Amino acid sequence: MAVSEVEIMKQIQALSRGGVRLFRNNVGFDAQNKVKYGLMPGSSDLIGWTQIEITPHHVGLKVAIFTAIEVKSEFGRIRPDQQRFVDFVDECGGISGICRSVADAKTLLNLS
């Protein structure tokens, strides 16, 4: 039986410790209160940062790198706006990717 996107997301979000912080990014519109929420249409399911150490010029300085993870189940489809957001984060020097498992997220985040 395939693991659901929600379950994969919870497992990946549990990696949020040490230098990695991931937060759920719900995107939508509440018609009753006329309020938009989330970053923007197509933005990733999990956003946050990954801390890295810069060397040699900034020896010892730790920097938070914007991190965006789009979580999909084994057969989940990536919408074009979601792919554009992931590509944009990459182009701007962030860490981003499509993850279908905790193993995918560990690889993306360089966690053992």
Question: What residues fall within each predicted segment?
Answer:
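Catalytic phosphate/metal-binding cores of nucleic-acid and nucleotide-processing enzymes, i.e., regions
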Residues: M1-S112
